[in-house]
Curated annotation (Swiss-Prot):
Pathway: tRNA modification; 5-methoxycarbonylmethyl-2-thiouridine-tRNA biosynthesis
Cross-link Glycyl lysine isopeptide (Gly-Lys) (interchain with K-? in acceptor proteins): residue positions: G101
Protein's name according to its UniProt entry: Ubiquitin-related modifier 1 homolog
PTM sites of type 1-thioglycine: G101
Subunit structure, as described in the record: Interacts with cer.
Family designation: Belongs to the URM1 family.
Predominant location: cytoplasm
Xref: PANTHER family: RURM1 PROTEIN
Highest rank taxon of the organism: Eukaryota
Length: 101
């Protein structure tokens, strides 16, 4: 048997995609041997796919205020935020509410 995999979908909307190479949807296959929380995922995203101005997406170890996070269409605040443990086929959507004027 091969290494266990954790497949999830990341989506970016309302300008958040501009920080990730202008790609609105990514299907990820993560190492299923480790526990993946949103906190781990954010660190992975910063190291691997965040291409532009990380200060507009991250503040410390979390997303900055103004970035909404939905996990399977549910506000992450209802699911434990950074401590939420990712499950197979989870859909994680990041929506930017930060807009210049």
């Amino acid at each position: 048997m091969g290494t266990p995999e954790l497949k999830i979908i990341l989506e970016f909307s309302a300008g958040a995609e501009l920080l990730f190479g202008n790609i609105k949807r990514r299907e990820l296959v993560l190492d299923g041997n480790q526990k993946w929380t949103i906190a781990n995922l954010l660190k992975w995203m910063h190291a691997n796919i965040l291409t532009e101005r990380p200060e507009l997406f991250l503040q410390g170890d979390t997303v900055r205020p103004g970035i909404l996070v939905l996990i399977n269409d549910t506000d992450w605040e209802l699911l434990g935020e950074l401590d939420y443990e990712l499950q197979p086929n989870d859909n994680v959507l990041f929506i930017s509410t930060l807009h210049g004027g």
